[in-house]
Amino acid sequence: RPNVTLQMEVEDLRNASPATVSRAGVIFISSNDLGWRPMAQGYLKKRRKAEAEVLQSFFDKYVDLALALLRELTPRMAISEMGLVSSLLSMLTALTAEHREQLAARELSEPAETAHLERLFLFALAWSVGGTLETADRARFDKFLRSASSILPEAGTTIGSSPSDTIYSFVVSATSGEWEHWGKRVPSWRPPQGDLGAAF
């Protein structure tokens, strides 16, 4: 008589009946044992080959060092390393989609395009891995990035910037692929003139 075995992979057991749970086998693999690299590898397999090779070099160069530094700092909230790298991947997906036209204009073998992709990676790294840091720790994270990379904007030399600015004061322009100060994008707020009471 033939036997049938069903194997189902579910995210959780919220909607499972007691009969299902009693027959379920649960395998737990700690993220500490697994690490972030398999998740990054899965992400890179979905990218264009040339782009994946360039991004792989950035993952190798920055991520382990950034996570090691984060252990010495005091983030505002505790997020697992897998969660931080997941945020990094999500930001990279969004940023490369926004910059797709600019990135596709030239081959990734060109230094200008590799530098553009590295700027996007550093921006995503700062706002994912270093995104929950306070001002003092952000300055340390910025110092680490500047010691590891030579393509960060020089504070005080970009339009709208001051010498105390960090990477958090800049964004990568979708048109030029260069660093742009947030102050250039966001106009200074001025209170409306006239009687504010009339608005109510």
Where are the language model's segments positioned?
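Conserved phosphate-handling catalytic cores of large alpha/beta enzymes
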Residues: R48, E53, V63
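A short helix-turn-beta junction within AAA+ P-loop NTPase domains corresponding to the substrate/partner-engaging
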Residues: A16-K45
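C-terminal, well-structured subdomains that either form a transmembrane helix-short loop-helix hairpin
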Residues: T5, E11, A198-F200
